[in-house]
A protein has these predicted regions:
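Single conserved hydrophobic/aromatic residue that forms the stacking wall/gate
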Residues: 1-9
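Multi-pass alpha-helical transmembrane bundle typical of ion/small-solute transporters
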Residues: 10-252
Length: 253
């Protein structure tokens, strides 16, 4: 009986270590995501000299933190819409998904290639779950919804950018380029603020969803509500990563 009890305690400790490993990897993913995707928010503003690079990065870091704290809708989607049930996965599966996503992010950062951390994470989860448990464990409806958003995002943005540019040319086409540049620089700062805030409110929540899903599958929490400490940790990791800055990708952009 004593030996059996010792084995149970050891198994429980091993499970706890794996959960904390996932927490560490998820925060590492958030940190890397911060400096990997910083360019998305500030590349245009920096390239046109609307704002100094250091000021742009610090502004983006602060707004990423604030954005990460506003809601948990994306976190619940990541935590609840990809897998049919939290009981079907474990910390080892989630660790594999995170390691795959982190590796891809680091490679693309090293090569200076802009890429989506969201695509990497979603692909890592699907691959790890499909290999270890089987693709039947995946929530088909949830994955279709996520894939549609990933595919449609650049298409909708491209169409929106084309339409807005057409309208701007019709309104301001006759103005002097010098006058326009001065006025639009301030508007670029506003757009960078909006981009940074939305980046934090979207991307930081992916790590929140991963950690919350792990805590739920391990029996540490009872619902898919994101704990406050998870929000704070993910927001801080994202902000710190952003403060470091991804100069290679900014140069490419």
């Amino acid at each position: 009986y004593r030996r059996q009890r010792q084995m149970c305690i050891r198994d429980r400790l091993d499970a706890q270590y794996l959960v904390w490993l996932v927490v560490f990897l998820a925060l590492a993913f958030d940190y890397i995501n911060g400096f990997h995707d910083t360019a998305n928010a500030i590349a245009t503003s920096v390239s046109t000299r609307a704002i100094e690079p250091k000021k742009a990065i610090m502004m983006t870091a602060a707004l990423n933190f604030l954005g990460a704290m506003v809601s948990t809708g994306v976190a619940k989607t990541i935590g609840g819409d990809i897998v049919m049930s939290a009981s079907l996965i474990n910390s080892a599966i989630i660790s594999a998904a995170l390691i795959g996503a982190i590796t891809w992010n680091l490679l693309t950062w090293y090569w200076g290639i802009p890429s989506s951390s969201s695509h990497a994470l979603i692909g890592g989860i699907i691959g790890a779950v499909g290999w270890s448990v089987g693709f039947d464990a995946l929530n088909e409806a949830g994955i279709i919804k996520i894939f549609l958003s990933l595919i449609l995002s650049p298409i909708v943005a491209m169409i929106g950018g084309y339409i807005v540019m057409k309208v701007l040319l019709l309104i301001f086409g006759r103005f002097s380029p010098i006058v326009l540049n001065d006025r639009f620089r301030s508007m670029q700062i506003v757009s960078a603020i909006m981009m940074a805030f939305s980046h934090g409110s979207n991307d930081a929540q992916k790590a929140m969803g991963i950690i919350t899903l792990t805590l739920l599958s391990g029996g540490f929490i009872d619902t898919l509500e994101v704990p406050v400490w998870v929000k704070l940790c993910c927001a801080t990791a994202m902000a710190m990563g952003t403060a470091v800055g991804g100069w290679k990708i900014i140069s490419t952009m």
